[in-house]
């Protein structure tokens, strides 16, 4: 679009990185997108997806429920994607918390038109751009002042109802839920209400392939099975890359969308680091890696709720994953995407956060590693069979991915798939896309965008292109196919 000849070197055999799916015995396990921010017009990310050819002709599912959280005594919190319905449900569940519930619903409504500035990179802002952004944010200052440093756990403590207090902290279906920024939750539910954050039918890999197709159509080149070992540097200027096979490829500019730690400390030998950059990797928390259990089941689950992120419920018999006992499990039924399994069959997913070091050590003994994955699959199937009698006999496919799986395919530090952990501290943190003392080198992706996600990683790459265009005194151009 902007006159640059580019080529991508990818260590995997397919596009997408963490935005991926994989096939197992006639089933497709989706490993990434629960929803896509900007899935329909009216949301600021939508034009960006249009530029990439990612949304044209694509069907999106807008769920009625974001999540379900069940209690031990039969209580159920349904996080409806419709704000009015969510408010009514919460009031029925805990009428004594009327004031707090109404405040919560009001805060979601207040974020419906929140403007996410994605059209222009902050690094190329001029004075007028800054004034324009400030004026757009002005109506939201009171919300940011009130909730900017508040976590879901902080807000949950205001509920009198004990079940609601517990369930609210699990409503984002993350085990670090209590520490999740309340603002991020408010914005997400506002998008859900406006139906601008749907699930892309076909799954994550097909979504990534549409972007690959757009890139190739524009003349780009992609080299798969091409792991970069070193960034070539001459006189403090990036001049190309050396692959693991020893071949070298020269260039005027190098952009790394690879793992941040690997890029900085291995590919560049840690030579271009200051205290700020070092501090990120020494002190910032990384999102916990996961054990991802995918099952192919000859069952339609027609009576099971279709949700964005799954149903979280207590277990009669705890499951031990990564050496830690779990008394709850979150399960997602993908019967809303007919492309992932044949008619009457369903992909079922259970995901657990875990400890990287546990799996790294276990991986050194292949037999024990394999046996542990089988044991976890057995326990998940048994737990599901207690909830859905007869399910165990209907399981046709089992697949367990661990942090070592994610590390092997993506190179991500500690096997994480989200990068930096999203928190009230990192939510508004900005990281430089360059390294001190190194010219013609840029970084893009989740390691320079705290909180991760496909939209922010995509925006990151677009922003780097704008930065380069400004450096080269060119007008940035973005077209739609």
Regions found by a protein language model. Name each.
Residues 1-113:
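N-terminal glycine-rich phosphate/pyrophosphate-binding loop and immediately adjacent elements
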Residues 62, 224-226:
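Short loop/edge segments at beta-strand edges and connector loops
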Residues 233, 469-481:
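Active-site-proximal substrate-binding core of FAD-dependent oxidoreductases
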Residues 298-404:
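C-terminal segments that line or cap access tunnels to active or ligand-binding sites in enzymes
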């Amino acid at each position: 679009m902007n006159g640059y000849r580019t080529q991508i070197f990818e260590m995997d055999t397919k596009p997408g990185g963490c935005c991926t799916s994989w096939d197992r015995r006639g089933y497709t396990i989706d490993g990434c997108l629960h929803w896509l921010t900007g899935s329909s017009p009216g949301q600021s990310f939508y034009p960006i997806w249009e530029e990439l050819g990612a949304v044209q002709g694509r069907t999106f599912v807008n769920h009625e429920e974001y999540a379900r959280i069940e209690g031990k005594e039969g209580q159920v919190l349904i996080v409806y994607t419709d704000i009015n319905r969510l408010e009514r449900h919460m009031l029925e569940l805990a009428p004594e918390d009327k004031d707090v519930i109404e405040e919560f619903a009001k805060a979601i409504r207040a974020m419906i038109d929140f403007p996410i500035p994605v059209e222009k990179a902050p690094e190329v802002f001029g004075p007028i751009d800054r004034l324009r952004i400030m004026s757009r944010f002005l109506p939201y200052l009171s919300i940011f002042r009130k909730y900017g440093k508040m976590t879901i756990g902080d807000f949950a403590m205001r509920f009198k109802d004990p079940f609601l207090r517990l369930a609210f902290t699990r409503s984002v279906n993350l085990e670090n839920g209590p520490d999740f920024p309340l603002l991020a939750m408010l914005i997400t539910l506002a998008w859900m209400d406006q139906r601008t954050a749907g699930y892309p039918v076909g799954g994550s890999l097909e979504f990534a392939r549409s972007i690959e197709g757009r890139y190739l159509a524009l003349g780009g080149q992609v080299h798969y099975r091409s792991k970069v070992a070193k960034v070539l540097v001459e006189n403090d200027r990036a001049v190309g890359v050396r692959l693991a096979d020893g071949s070298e490829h020269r260039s005027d500019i190098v952009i790394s969308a690879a793992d941040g730690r690997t890029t900085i400390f291995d590919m560049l030998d840690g030579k271009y680091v200051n205290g700020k950059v070092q501090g990120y990797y020494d002190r910032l928390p990384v999102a916990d890696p996961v054990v991802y259990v995918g099952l192919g089941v000859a069952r339609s689950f027609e009576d099971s709720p279709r949700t964005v992120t799954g149903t979280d419920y207590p277990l009669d018999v705890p499951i031990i994953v990564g050496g830690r006992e779990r008394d709850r499990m979150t399960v997602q039924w993908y019967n809303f995407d007919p492309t992932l399994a044949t008619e009457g069959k369903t992909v079922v997913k259970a995901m657990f956060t875990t400890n990287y070091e546990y799996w790294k050590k276990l991986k050194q003994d292949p037999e024990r590693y394999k046996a542990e994955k089988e044991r976890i699959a057995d326990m998940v199937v048994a737990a599901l069979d207690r909830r859905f009698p007869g399910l165990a006999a209907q399981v046709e496919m089992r697949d367990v991915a661990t942090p070592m799986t994610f590390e092997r395919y993506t190179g991500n530090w500690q096997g994480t798939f989200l990068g930096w952990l999203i928190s009230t501290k990192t939510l508004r943190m900005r990281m430089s896309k360059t390294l001190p003392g190194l010219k013609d080198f840029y970084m893009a992706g989740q390691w320079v965008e705290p909180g991760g996600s496909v939209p922010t990683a995509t925006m990151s790459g677009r922003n780097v292109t704008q930065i380069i265009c400004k450096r080269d005194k060119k007008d940035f151009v973005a077209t739609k196919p």
